[in-house]
A protein has these predicted regions:
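Short, charge-patterned binding micro-sites
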Residues: 38-70
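Short beta-strand-to-loop capping motifs
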Residues: 8, 68-74, 117-123, 181-185
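Ordered, soluble secondary-structure elements with a strong preference for glycine-centered loop motifs
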Residues: 15-20, 73-78, 124-128, 187-191
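Extended, well-folded interaction surfaces typified by the phenylalanyl-tRNA synthetase beta subunit core
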Residues: 2, 7-9, 13, 17, ...
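Core RNA-modification/binding signature centered on pseudouridine synthases
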Residues: 139-235
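Ordered, amphipathic secondary-structure segments that act as subunit-interaction surfaces
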Residues: 62-116
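Short amphipathic alpha-helices in soluble, non-transmembrane regions
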Residues: 78-87, 128-140, 196-197
Length: 235
């Protein structure tokens, strides 16, 4: 058995697929590429494929990772070629590397992500004004997002600053704004990109519709002791 770690992308053409639909599409690619993938045992066998995260509907990813267990070693470049030849528009294998079967699961180590959040401005504004408002957030020790759960009928308060460890930056492109934000997932969980966007709109006067935003994840790492490592670097 060989465990192959792949860096892949879920481009804009697939951004509105749910995670389950995206995973199903990837399984079809693996089948069509005729790879010797391993299956679980039992009454309902399934491919031994695992993703680093479950991307939300509407979120594209220039960088995502998946592990696939193969019955035998196949040349990485051959896997890449075969999968890309059978891939739908919006999906591609970028690179790959074999890892130890004792390596930690991707979901256990992928805890730091960079996103590009984009949406239309609701008013004309200079970039330096945006940056001054963002500076207030960047220097704040606390920025609380209130998350209401209809299921429990309770409101949970999340200090977004526990998860946004680096300054958010902005770029204005015509009537649109692009925010670059890095989000850390700690023991208590993480915040969603949409929640950061909403917080900035409602509490820090960033002139955007708090509900109108598209997100693209542009990087994914394992953050350990203040250092970011690629998921290929992990043992």
């Amino acid at each position: 058995m060989a465990r192959l770690r792949l860096a892949i992308k879920k481009d804009k053409a697939l951004r509105f697929l749910s995670h389950l639909d995206f995973a199903r599409a990837v399984r079809y690619v693996v089948i069509r590429a005729d790879l010797p993938v391993q299956y679980s045992e039992g009454f309902n066998p399934h491919m031994k494929i695992a993703f680093a995260s479950a991307l939300g509907v509407g979120v594209a990813a220039a960088e995502e990772y998946m592990d696939i267990e193969l019955a035998e070693t196949v040349d990485v470049e051959d896997v890449k070629r075969r999968m890309n030849e059978k891939a739908p528009e919006g999906f591609a294998v970028l690179e790959g590397r074999y890892v130890s079967d004792k390596a930690p699961k991707l979901m256990a180590i992928a805890n730091y992500a960079e996103y590009l959040l984009s949406g239309p401005l609701t008013e004309s504004i200079e970039e330096d004004v945006i940056n001054r408002r963002l500076d207030v957030f960047n220097k704040a020790e606390e920025a609380v997002y209130e998350k209401y759960s209809p299921k429990t009928r309770k409101t949970r308060c999340i200090n977004v600053k526990d998860h946004v460890l680096e300054p958010i930056t902005a770029q204005i492109d015509g009537s649109d704004i692009h925010l670059r934000v890095r989000i850390y997932q700690n023991e208590s969980g993480a915040v969603k990109p949409s929640q950061v966007w909403e917080l900035l709109a409602r509490q820090f006067d960033i002139p955007v519709d708090p509900t109108l935003m598209l997100a693209e994840r542009t990087g994914l790492w394992s953050r350990q002791k203040g250092e970011n490592r690629t998921l290929f670097e992990m043992p």
